[in-house]
Amino acid sequence: MKILVALSGGVDSAVSAKILKDAGYEIEGCYMKLHGRDDYHAKNIEKVQDVGNFLEIKTHILDLCDDFKREVFEPFLQTYKVGKTPNPCALCNRTIKFGKFLDFARSKGCDKIATGHYAKIENNLIKSAVDLSKDQSYFLANIEPRVIPNIVFPLGNMLKKDVKKFAASFPELEKISKSSESNEICFVENTYIDVLREFYKTETPGIVRNLQGEIVGKHNGYMNFTVGKRRGFDVFGAHEPHYVVKIDAKKNEIVVGSKADLDKNEFETQNFNAFLNIDEILKMDEIYVKIRYRSAKIACKIEISLNDNLNNESLTDKNLNFENSDFLNNQDLKAKIILKTPANGVASGQLAVFYDKSDCVIASGFIA
């Protein structure tokens, strides 16, 4: 079996390649150029070539900058522009790392691709990694279900500290083993607002309203805020903390309330991405949802229906087979999520990820 390994220049991808090589697989490496900063790429490519020389494997450089700009970066900007909170990693994994990269691997005669993500695959489902502090199953939950048989995650059963220890045992990988962690969003060096300032006038004064619609303060531009933020705006005569509850991009207004006002008992998602048959998901006794990467899982119930532009007929009691239905395009489906306990700070634009009781990802959807 021939596997193309995504090499970033970091320890996780290097160890992934080493593990697969030691296991007897025929492997090649590939570095993906996703955004600008030539000096950034030059340093990483040098590291990737060093890993390739150490493992005695062929390495490729795949320029996906145009695809990344169109599929990830521009939607990132647009999502903030309309007052929502984007999840660029979820978009990148679907369209770039497990889309274009997989296409490239096939063009090179490879059977599968491998990455340094901390996750597992079990029964054709993505599953949480052993190292829950590094688990990346959340970010992988938006990939197309059909690509899972073509993916390998060598680090799924390893702890991060053991990955570094393993790398340090080889002189050729010792330097990489001591490298710092990469940014959560690869193209954001400091904060997201610094990126937005390059394209938008982010400092535009606006008003703050309470939940009753009354003007209670002022702010310096709605793009500076996400749901749940409690600083950066002024509330006249406030004696207790206020939190952003809602953002009105068209009016350049934010709505604030107490922390309790952030609690939601239900919400809707768009682009429902199912990894199991719809009827199988609907019949599950236990389903848990994460509303953002670092949030705890919350028990929930899912009600699935067609998007408004198709039909609003509920599918809750229908016996629909996902594989043999007309719903292979996740754009067709939306879901209503009913929480067993309230969730704090549900943000439109973020990814909601659904797990079964064994920590396998069964579906995902973007919060409406």
Swiss-Prot record:
It is an enzyme of class 2 (transferase). It comes from the Bacteria. InterPro entries: MnmA-like, MnmA-like_C, MnmA-like_central, MnmA-like_central_sf, Rossmann-like_a/b/a_fold. The keyword 4Fe-4S does not apply. Disulfide bonds join 92-186. Residues 134-136, 292-293 are annotated as: Interaction with tRNA. One of its GO terms (molecular function) is ATP binding. GO terms for cellular component: cytoplasm. It is found in: Cytoplasm. ATP binds at residues 6-13, 32, 116. GO terms for biological process: tRNA wobble position uridine thiolation. The record marks 117, 350 as: Interaction with tRNA. It catalyses: S-sulfanyl-L-cysteinyl-[protein] + uridine(34) in tRNA + AH2 + ATP = 2-thiouridine(34) in tRNA + L-cysteinyl-[protein] + A + AMP + diphosphate + H(+). Pfam families: tRNA_Me_trans, tRNA_Me_trans_C, tRNA_Me_trans_M. The active site is at 92 (nucleophile), 186 (cysteine persulfide intermediate). Its EC number is 2.8.1.13. Keywords: ATP-binding, Cytoplasm, Disulfide bond, Nucleotide-binding, RNA-binding, Transferase, tRNA processing, tRNA-binding. Belongs to the MnmA/TRMU family. Catalyzes the 2-thiolation of uridine at the wobble position (U34) of tRNA, leading to the formation of s(2)U34. NCBIfam families: PRK00143.1 (NF001138), trmU (TIGR00420). This is tRNA-specific 2-thiouridylase MnmA. It comes from Campylobacter hominis (strain ATCC BAA-381 / DSM 21671 / CCUG 45161 / LMG 19568 / NCTC 13146 / CH001A).
